[in-house]
Amino acid sequence: MELLIDNRQDRYEITDALIELINKAVEACLIYEGWEIDYEVSLSFVDNQEIQALNHTYRGKDYATDVLSFPLIEENQGLDLEEKLLGDIVISVEKAAEQAKEYNHSFEREMGFLVVHSMFHLMGYDHDHDEATADMRKREEAVLTAINLLR
């Protein structure tokens, strides 16, 4: 598994320990779904201003969000087994820090959750209705528990 990291913010330190945790989270998602772990995922760390611009451009929503997912798997297309790049994850580190404080858990737990959440989007899951949301939450909690990233 290769994680291609682009840190485009300078407000928060992205430590080696955090990168190790993120790698573990990405691999745990693939393993949970029974996928091989030889995929590439692009992960960009940005600030609220940049993610707001991306959110506006790609989703028509003019506010900062925590994470954006850009899967290379088209809906209902399935995975091309020859394609090894799953897609791109963009995380607002600034928003993650705000949410960690708001939810009263660690920054690492919030970053891990956002990566896991986004990975399931890259793997074709969504939360566009109640049943899909419940299914996605179940998967997220299972992976977070497996890597001991509890609330």
UniProtKB/Swiss-Prot annotation:
Gene of this entry: ybeY
NCBIfam families per the UniProt record, alphabetical: rRNA maturation RNase YbeY (TIGR00043)
Binding site for Zn(2+): 117, 121, 127
Gene3D superfamilies, per the entry: Metalloproteases ('zincins'), catalytic domain
Cofactor(s) needed: Zn(2+)
Protein localization: Cytoplasm
Molecular function as annotated in GO: metalloendopeptidase activity; RNA endonuclease activity; zinc ion binding
Pfam families in the record: YbeY
Organism: Alkaliphilus oremlandii (strain OhILAs) (Clostridium oremlandii (strain OhILAs))
Protein name per UniProt: Endoribonuclease YbeY
